Amino acid sequence: MRQLKREVKIGNVTIGGKNPIAVQTMLNVPVEDIEGNVAQAKRCEAAGCQILRVTCPSAADAKCIEAVKNAVNIPIVADIHFDYKAALACADVGVDKIRINPGNIGDDDRVKAVVDACQQKNIPIRIGVNGGSLEKHILAKYGAPVPEAMVESALYHVRLLEKFDFNNIVISIKNSNVPRMMEAYRQLSAVTDYPLHVGVTEAGTYQMGLLKSGMGIGGMLLEGIGDTIRVSLAADPEKEVEAGYNILRAVGFPVAGPEVITCPTCGRTQYPCTEIANEVERRLQGCKKSIKVAVMGCVVNGPGEAREADIGIAGGKSEAVLFVHGEPVRKLTGENILDQFMEEIYKL
C-alpha cells in the first residue's frame, strides 16, 4: 500500500497524497547553450516528461531557466549548488521548484534569503541528499555514506528550512548503491511526511543504469514509497523518461500507452517472433491507448500468456493464432502476419 505524504504543488503538477507518480528528467546540454537546452526541453516534454530539471550554476544562468520555462508547459526545477544568488535569480524568473542542499549555500542568512524568496512565490524546495557529497561531520561520524548517515543529513537540512517556518519541501536521498539507497528511503519515509523524490544516482552506463534504477526505484514503489521518480542514465534525457514510465508500468501503476510483452523464444519458435514484437512496439510509439499487446513464440505457453493481454498472437509455422480479450478469434496466415496483426490492434 502506498505511503501517503503531504501534497506539494510544483507548477501545474501536484505530487504526494494520492496523486500519480510524476516522471522527471534533467537536461544535459551545457547551460550556456540556451537554444540547445530549449530544443532538448521540448523533446523531453514530447516524450512525456512531467517535471524537468535544469542546472543553474550562477545567477547569470537564470536566463537559461527562463528561456526553457517559456518554451514548455511543464514545471521547471532549478538545480542549485553553492551560489544562493542563483536560487534568488531563478525565483525571480518564475521557476517552479528549486533543488538545493541548504548546508552548501552558506550561512543562515543566505538560507533565509532563499527561503523568503521561495515563500513569497510559493516555490517548493527539494532537499537533494547524495551519498557522494555528505557533510564532513556526518561522514566522520558514520565512516561511510550508510543509510543512517544519509537520513541524518536529510533531516539536518529539513530542520534548517523549518527553522524559518518553511515546509513546502520535497526530499530525495540518493545513492549509487541500490541496497543502501533502498534502506535510506525506508528509514526516511518512516520519520517524515514530506513527499519523496526517488532515484538511484550515478547508476552507471545505460544498461547498468536501467537495471539498478529498475531494482531501486521499482523496489521502493512496490513498498509504497515514492511520489516522483527520476531514472538517471548516461543517455539522452528522453530515454530517462521512457525508462521511468516503463518502471511504473512494470510495478503495476496505470500508464497511458501500450505495453508489448513477448517471450524470449526457444527452439520451438517457427516464425520471427522477436522481430515482429520489436516492430509492433515501434509502430505503436506515440499511441496513448493503455493496452497490453502480446507476441508469443509458440503454442506451448503462448496461448495462455496471450490470453492475459488485450490482444495477442501465438505463432506457429507460417501462421499465428489471434487472441482478443483472452479469446481466440482467428488465424493470421501468409507473409503479412505483422500487418494483419497491426490492423487488429488499431481496431481496439
Locate the predicted segments by residue.
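Glycine-rich, proline-tolerant flexible connector loops at the mouths of alpha/beta enzymes
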Residues: 34, 45-69, 99-107, 169-178
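N-terminal amphipathic alpha-helix/helix-capping segment at the start of soluble metabolic enzymes
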Residues: 1-26, 119, 282
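Hydrophobic faces of well-ordered beta-strands that scaffold small-molecule active sites
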Residues: 21-27, 52-54, 76-80, 98-100, ...
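Active-site mouth loops of central-metabolism enzymes
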Residues: 18-36, 55, 74-82, 138-151, ...
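Glycine-enriched alpha-helix->loop->beta-strand junction motifs that scaffold or abut catalytic
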Residues: 71-74, 92-98, 119-122, 189-195, ...
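Hydrophobic or amphipathic alpha-helical targeting/insertion segments
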Residues: 85-126
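Alpha-helix-loop-beta-strand connector modules within alpha/beta enzyme cores
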Residues: 59-80, 113-125, 185-196, 280-284
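Catalytic alpha/beta core domains of metabolic enzymes, predominantly
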Residues: 129-133, 138-285
